[in-house]
Structure formats: C-alpha cells, structure tokens
Amino acid sequence: DETLIKLDGTKQKKRLGANAILSVSLASCKVAALSNKISLFKYIGNKKTLPLPLMNIINGGKHANNSLRIQEFMIRPDKAKNFNEALNICFLVIQKLKSLLIGKDLSTNVGDEGGFAPSISSNELAIELILEAIDKAGFKAGTDISLCLDVAANELYKEKKYSVNSSKFISSEKTIEYYLNLCKKYPIKSIEDPFFENDWDAWINLTQHLNNNIQIVGDDLFVTNKERLLKGIKSKAANTILVKPNQIGTLTETLEVINLAHLNGYKTIISHRSGDSEDTFIADLAVATNSSQ
C-alpha cells in the first residue's frame, strides 16, 4: 500500500485512481491470506465477533423514484443471538412489509440500494409502515429491532438550510428539532449524515443532544479520511463512522481510520458503496476489525 501511495503521489489518488489502487490493495491482502493458508478475516485482524446487519428496506432521496426526502430507512435486529438469526429476522420483516405495501396498493419496486421504493412522500409514513411490518412479523420495535436512518443531507442542503421533511428549506436549528422529535416519537437508534458534510456546528449540536442514546453516523462527514475523523473527534461531532474502503483507496489507510475511531470511542460500521460489486471483502473486514455493524 505504501508503494502504491508513493507511486500515485497525489493526496486524492488522482494519478492512478483510488479504485485501481484499492483493487490491488485488497487483492494483495487476499493473496497473503491464501499463501499463509488462513481465513481472510484472521489475516486482517483475527477477531471473531460477527456484526449486526443494518438492512435497508425502504429507499428514498436520490436512491428512489419517489418523493421521500430521507434516503434510507433501515432496521437493525438488536436482539439476534447470531448472524443467521439476524438475517432471518430482517427477512421476515421485509416479507411483511411487502405484503403491507401490496395491501395498500403501493409499489413494491425497489430503489438503488434494494429497499422498497413506494410512491409516498412522508418520512413518518415510511417509518409507520416499517413499525407495522415489525409488529406483524412478531417482533417488538425498540426492543427486538431498532430503526436506523440515512438522511444523506448533502442532497437536501441549500444556502445553509435543509429540506429534510418537505420541499421547504428550514434552518439547521429547526432541522435538529425535527430529528429530536422523530427520536422521541419512534425507536430510532441511528441517524447517518443528518447534516451537510461541512456544517460542523450542526453536527456538534445534534451530537450533544443525542450522544448518549443515538448513533450519529458520519459518512459524507468523514469519507473514511483520518484528517476529517480527527477533526470530528476533537470537536465531538458524531460518535460513529461509516467506513468505505474505496473512499480512501487502500486497506492500510482504512485500517488506520478504524483503529483511530476505536481508540477514541467511536463505533465503526463497515459499508459497501452505492453501485459496488458483489465482492465479499468487507464482510471479512467487519469481523477482523471487531466492527459492531
């Protein structure tokens, strides 16, 4: 990885390209694991804790052809005893959600991330549908299963204002109030990218309000970048980082970011990238780094 970084010679990996560099980086790691005749996750980190899946079940925003403002509505099976049970719980909820949508004459077409993309415009209605599906599947929302949101606020930001709940733009302070009310009303345990990537004051403010109870997840905020994560740690913005290896370009730099996060009490969520391949490397990475999700 160090050789690749030096060969490229640019901060943003513009000469060789981050995707090309990452492909060589991950392939080298796989070859090393094979040559040592050990599992990939053991070669990377030798951890044995399986993460909880965050299952994306309703799509909105740029990922769907509907009017939902929030980009991803997810479920997290908190009480699952193992990964197989976690997947089964999510599958049962998805089945019930599909039946509910059909019963309400709503589309079961899927968005870019595989979640349903019904023609609805209310964030609250999307949440209510998920809660009903959880109940019909025989689980208790807030105990067995938590709700997680990816707002993708970069897409809802204009002139220091946000259009998170409707086409009307409101201040960051009013947007914080909206999030706080959502979290009081519903069993939401994680909010990803609630604000624009450079609106640090809003990130800090929301983290102060929700830090003890809710995951405030930085994806666009941190972009798997050590410098941006350090700024977040120092300013106490967010408490969780979404990790995408192809945002930074090498496995070594990805591991450095994960280690920095863990050393400073930040949780890590290992994630694919929109339009990613079916390669399974990130599953091994999640286990190897003891990432909880």
What are these model-derived regions, one by one?
Residues 1-2, 39-56, 88, 144-148, ...:
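Beta-strand segments within the central parallel beta-sheet cores of soluble alpha/beta enzyme folds
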Residues 72-83, 107-123, 152-165:
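Active-site-proximal beta-alpha loop/turn segments in soluble metabolic enzymes
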Residues 48-111:
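Mobile "lid/hinge" segments at catalytic clefts and subdomain interfaces of large enzymes
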Residues 24-32, 36, 73, 130, ...:
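Buried hydrophobic packing segments
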Residues 1-38, 87, 115:
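Metal- or metallocofactor-binding catalytic centers and their adjacent structured scaffolds
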Residues 54, 76-88, 119, 163-173, ...:
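Active-site mouth loops of central-metabolism enzymes
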Residues 124-293:
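Catalytic core of soluble alpha/beta enzymes
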Residues 1-13, 46-54, 94-105, 135, ...:
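Short, hydrophobic/aliphatic alpha-helical segments
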